[in-house]
Curated annotation (Swiss-Prot):
Keywords: Cell inner membrane, Cell membrane, Membrane, Multifunctional enzyme, NAD, Quinone, Translocase, Transport, Ubiquinone. InterPro entries: NADH_DH_suC (IPR010218), NADH_DH_suCD (IPR023062), NADH_Q_OxRdtase_suD (IPR001135), NADH_quin_OxRdtase_su_C/D-like (IPR037232), NADH_UbQ_OxRdtase_30kDa_su (IPR001268), NADH_UbQ_OxRdtase_49kDa_CS (IPR014029), NADH_UbQ_OxRdtase_CS (IPR020396), NDH1_su_D/H (IPR022885). NDH-1 shuttles electrons from NADH, via FMN and iron-sulfur (Fe-S) centers, to quinones in the respiratory chain. The immediate electron acceptor for the enzyme in this species is believed to be ubiquinone. Couples the redox reaction to proton translocation (for every two electrons transferred, four hydrogen ions are translocated across the cytoplasmic membrane), and thus conserves the redox energy in a proton gradient. NDH-1 is composed of 13 different subunits. Subunits NuoB, CD, E, F, and G constitute the peripheral sector of the complex. Its EC number is 7.1.1.-. The lineage of its organism: Bacteria, Pseudomonadati, Pseudomonadota, Gammaproteobacteria, Enterobacterales. This is NADH-quinone oxidoreductase subunit C/D. Residues 217-603 are annotated as: NADH dehydrogenase I subunit D. It catalyses: a quinone + NADH + 5 H(+)(in) = a quinol + NAD(+) + 4 H(+)(out). PANTHER family: NADH-QUINONE OXIDOREDUCTASE SUBUNIT C_D, NADH-UBIQUINONE OXIDOREDUCTASE 49 KDA SUBUNIT. HAMAP family: NDH1_NuoC, NDH1_NuoCD_1, NDH1_NuoD.
Length: 603
């Protein structure tokens, strides 16, 4: 029975239409009804801005295949994960479920998404694997099985991915402890140490690999988890025939901190500092999707000044991250000097960020409904000095290193893939745009007032190789400088917080005049604001690709479920598909061109 839920709260009245109900009338809903019948689905009303459709488990693959072959198809599996529904109280009109799995599909041609959900009983946690339709479902299904115990039948290798192989239990279940103090004290006996070492020993047969061919044995090489070219605690096992990579297995999880589980134990406000540490180079960029998603739940419209301030800080951190990426890529190819120059330039950005926010790498400065405080005196002078400094420095990187024939020879045509492969593996950011697909969320789905800025989206010519990816990042720095110039010239006047009951913390000045305001301030700071029961979603163009938060509120001071989708996770999953048949030296250049940090992968 089609059930368009109508129990959204009264606060929907203050939300823009695109944030509330228009997704219920998305054309894809009609296409699905025409194909599968009017009674096949439950359509859920949310504040995600995305059609959310509950499908029967038996129809999942058929529906996915239908969406993949529409005239304007849903060509990317953007995200896939699960939820423990057992303690959720606000489920009016939803199918009965102990657990659920969601599939977030994206259409470039439509510039629209759809989310499919499957309800599961605790006694039958089985669902067919989506890898038959999208290869990047592999890692997502492994993580979902690991975190919830949901089995994906037909999966090629359903095993742990974030946790050690010997780990017991499923951490994102509601009955699983969230704090270390809830566990017994950890002791490492000699026997346990030997067991852990044995579990980490790579066995080719477990991954469908052969130890040799008819004439010779293959060599298996551990690259990482402490190799400098691995860019973090990242291990990749290489199957080698001489210098040629026959196959490889990326091994992640060494940096896993349980960021999504933490979201269930922190208030909506106190979780903001954790967002900075998911991708520790992005700073305020990481805070943007989270606070926007919470503001959708709350029904908050922030002042224009807040939007521009947020854009300004985000673009400063984008440049900061790109400079590190460009310089370390050059270093990976063999040139040492540029990385030291880049740290000089990045120091200027940190000085500016510190002057505005009080912190450097992890400001935790965005707030629900605004920012922590207004811009300080002299911010415009510091920004102007940086804008005068940076363009010439960027030109020097291009002239001295990126036009070097040796660097070009090492990177042009290396680790190349086309648009079809990029979409199949969930690639976003510069890696996707290098294939010729013009998709930047700041342009395609503007947020925080990006529609009011003039800037271009650098796009490649059809094939994404190492050199194209790094040169696009250079051009993105130039466009970020353009945006910053507009912030400098056109910073609006006005408040730095929204006048809304759920703005957190609320304006403190009023606490001196009204006891009710003082009580509200105390409760919101100590316990946190209570968000209406609903779901919200926000994606942004982060430094390394598309980053998003999918939040579920059950009418509490804390999130019921916090899903963090990061770009680096699918980018590393793509490595074997791209690098097979290449040399080890090509892999080093490829890793340098991806632009990832392991905290972004492992969360």
């Amino acid at each position: 029975m089609v059930n368009n839920m109508t129990d959204l709260t009264a606060q929907d009245a203050v939300l823009p239409v695109w944030q509330t109900r228009d997704h219920l009338d998305d054309p894809v809903i009609g296409e699905l009804r025409n194909r599968f019948g009017p009674d096949a689905f439950t359509v859920q009303a949310t504040r995600t801005g995305v059609p959310v459709v509950w499908v029967k488990r038996e129809q999942l693959l058929e529906v996915g295949e239908f969406l993949r072959k529409l005239p304007k198809p849903y060509v990317m599996l953007y995200d896939l994960h699960g939820m423990d529904e057992r303690l959720r109280t606000h489920r009016n009109g939803l199918p009965a479920a102990d657990f659920s799995v969601f599939y977030h599909l994206l259409s470039i041609d439509r510039n629209r998404d759809i989310m499919l959900k499957v309800a599961l009983s605790e006694n039958d946690l089985n669902v067919p694997t989506f890898t038959r339709l999208f290869p990047n479902a592999n890692w997502y299904e492994r993580e979902t099985w690991e975190m919830f115990g949901i089995t994906f039948t037909g999966h090629p290798n359903l095993r742990r991915i974030m946790m050690p192989p010997t780990w017991e239990g499923h951490p994102l279940r509601k009955d699983y402890p969230a704090r270390a103090t809830e566990f017994d004290p950890f002791t490492l006996t000699k026997q346990k140490e030997e067991l852990e070492m044995e579990a980490l020993t790579f066995k080719p047969e477990e991954w469908g690999m052969k130890r040799g061919n008819d004439t010779e044995d293959f060599m298996f090489l551990n690259l990482g988890p402490n190799h400098p070219s691995a860019h973090g605690a990242f291990r990749i096992i290489l199957q080698l025939d001489g210098e040629e990579i026959v196959d490889c297995v990326p091994d992640i999880g060494y940096h896993h901190r349980g960021a999504e589980k933490m979201g269930e134990r922190q208030s909506w406000h106190s979780y903001i500092p954790y967002t900075d540490r998911v991708e520790y180079l992005g700073g305020c960029v990481n805070e943007m999707p989270y606070v926007l998603a919470v503001e959708k739940l709350a029904g908050i419209q922030v002042p224009e000044r807040v939007e521009v301030i947020r854009v300004m800080l985000s673009e400063l951190f984008r440049i900061n991250s790109h400079l590190l990426y460009i310089s370390t890529f050059i270093q990976d190819v063999g040139a040492m000097t540029p990385v030291f120059f880049a740290f000089t330039d990045r120091q200027k950005i940190y000085d500016l960020v510190e002057a505005i926010t009080g912190f450097r790498m992890h400001p935790a400065w965005f707030r629900i409904g605004g920012v922590a405080h207004d811009l300080p005196r002299g911010w415009d002078r510091l920004l102007k000095e940086f804008l005068e400094w940076m363009p010439k420095r960027l030109d020097s990187y291009v002239k001295a290193a990126l036009k070097n024939t040796i660097l070009k020879g090492r990177s042009q045509g290396v680790a190349a893939y086309d648009a079809k492969e990029a979409l199949a593996w969930g690639t976003t950011g510069a890696g996707l745009r290098a294939t010729g697909i013009d998709f930047d969320v700041r342009k395609a789905r503007p947020y925080s007032g990006y529609q009011n800025f003039e800037f271009e989206v650098p796009v490649g010519g059809g094939i994404s190789d190492c050199y194209t990816r790094v040169m696009l990042k250079v051009e993105e720095v130039r466009q970020s400088l353009r945006i910053l110039e507009q912030c400098l010239k056109n910073m609006p006047e006005g408040p730095f917080k929204a006048d809304h009951p759920l703005t957190t913390p609320p304006p403190k000045e009023r606490t001196l005049q009204h006891i009710e305001t003082l009580i509200t301030h105390f409760l919101q700071v100590s316990w946190g604001p209570v968000m209406p029961a609903n779901e919200s979603f926000q994606m942004i163009e982060a430094t390394k690709g598309i980053n998003s938060y999918y939040l579920t509120s059950d009418g509490s001071t804390m999130s019921y479920r916090t899903r963090v989708r990061t770009p680096s996770f699918p980018h590393l999953q793509q490595i074997p598909s791209v690098i097979r048949g290449s040399l080890v030296s090509d892999l080093i250049v490829y890793l340098g061109s991806i632009d990832f940090v392991m905290s972004d992968v492992d969360r």
